[in-house]
Regions:
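Conserved acidic donor-binding segment of nucleotide-sugar-dependent glycosyltransferases
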Residues: 303, 307-314, 323-329
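Carbohydrate-associated surface elements
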Residues: 149, 170
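Nucleotide-activated donor-binding/catalytic signature segment of Leloir-type glycosyltransferases, i.e.
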Residues: 233-251
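Short hydrophobic beta-strand element within catalytic cores of glycosyltransferases
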Residues: 288-291
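N-terminal subdomain of nucleotide-sugar transferases
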Residues: 1-40, 44
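A short, histidine- and acid-enriched strand-loop-helix "catalytic/donor-clamping" loop
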Residues: 109-126, 142
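Conserved donor-binding/catalytic core segment of Leloir-type glycosyltransferases
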Residues: 180-199, 205-208, 221
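Aromatic "clamp/platform" in nucleotide-sugar-dependent glycosyltransferases that forms part
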Residues: 271
Length: 360
């Protein structure tokens, strides 16, 4: 999932800069230790981003894998012209590479962090990991996070830098846009990666059961796939829903937009979130939202565009959905969409990144 967020930032930055991306990943199936799939000459004409993809042969040894990871990045970087700036997404290993490039070649680097591991209740531990992360963050020219709460959480862990900047995730406003529709039964949409520990999808199903027991009409579409997909489906069957819940699996492109934009509102029941990009995509489609009040979500959801509820409280989640089923038509789709265009579009985020680069 992080790869998608990185890709969108790279595409936004490429509106104003020449951007090259280095992508390194293990692969069990390659024959050589390292394999280049795309080279610098292979340029994506649509998104104006040059990409070097290098795969390294996966070993049973963690130490060998770590060595091959760093070696693969070194090989990829050698194929690039000397960069003016290195932009690291997601710590800590890649940050070590950028720090080394700064020490050896004097190349400044900035960090963008998306990861919720710094938020309360998550796992950011280990003396060596924390010390290395502190050093990488300290020596960066800037640190950007997608929400203010993530920046605060990082600093609470002692990750200090004098130049923290909020740079939100990108929403493809040309793809996610309203579709005129008239549902005979109100349609609720949930989109997630089906990882129940963070997304609490079973908690959402519990809340939907409460609505069903009150004889409230609704249909709910679950979009996505993940490690707990089958478990969640089985959980829904166990509770004997009366056919008003539908699982689509993964949807992409226009198929995703068609399902999302023909909804009446979105619901997210997460236990923790860094930002909740699917909520932004819902706003771009003109949908209000019901969401748990966790992580960076209160920075984007308020009474003008949705309803916030405490996490892990099916009763209050059900009450909020019941309220939204009665009031979703009061929200103006264009107003919801315009709030996203102003701050989260490719152009807006790209300009913000360009300003950061120019000021280094």
């Amino acid at each position: 999932m992080f790869g998608l967020f990185v890709q969108r930032h790279a595409e936004a930055a490429a509106l104003y800069n020449n951007i090259s991306v280095v992508y390194v990943h293990p692969d069990d199936n390659i024959h050589d230790k390292y394999e280049f799939v795309n080279d610098i000459s292979c340029r994506d004409a649509i998104h104006r981003v040059s990409t070097i993809r290098i795969y390294y042969k996966k070993s049973k040894s963690k130490i060998i894998n770590l060595y091959r990871f760093f070696r693969a990045n070194k090989l990829a970087i050698k194929r690039l012209p000397k960069p003016d700036i290195i932009h690291v997404h997601v710590l800590t290993r890649l940050g070590l590479i950028a720090w080394w490039q700064k020490i050896v070649h004097g190349t400044p680097y900035i960090i963008t962090e998306h990861w919720s591991r710094y938020l309360p209740g998550n796992d950011f531990s280990g003396f060596l990991r924390k010390w290395l992360t502190k050093m990488v963050v300290k020596n960066a020219s800037a640190v950007t996070t997608v929400t203010d709460i993530l920046a605060q959480a990082m600093q609470n862990h002692g990750l200090q830098n004098n130049n923290y900047i909020i740079v939100p995730n990108v929403v493809n406003i040309n793809m996610f846009k309203p579709i005129e529709h008239h549902n005979s039964i109100p349609k609720i949409v949930h989109v997630s990666c089906f990882e129940n520990k963070s997304k609490n999808i079973t908690g959402l199903i519990d809340a939907l059961c409460i609505l069903e027991n009150k004889n409230i009409d609704y249909q709910c579409v679950f979009i996505g796939d993940g490690i707990d997909f089958e478990m969640v489906k089985d959980y829904s069957k166990k509770l004997k829903h009366q056919g008003n819940i539908r699982f689509t699996g993964v949807l992409e492109g226009q198929d995703l937009v068609d399902e999302l934009a023909t909804g009446d509102f979105m619901v997210l029941s997460s236990n923790y979130e860094t930002q909740g990009v699917v909520l932004l995509e819902a706003f771009a489609c003109g949908l209000p939202v019901v969401s748990t009040n966790v992580g960076g979500i209160p920075e984007i959801v308020n009474e003008s565009n949705g309803i916030l509820v405490p996490p892990q409280d099916p009763e209050k989640l059900a009450d909020a959905m019941q309220t939204m089923l009665q009031t979703y038509q009061n929200y103006n789709a264009n107003t919801l969409r315009n709030s996203i265009i102003k701050k989260f579009s490719n152009e807006s985020v790209g300009k913000l990144l360009n300003d950061i680069y120019k000021n280094l």
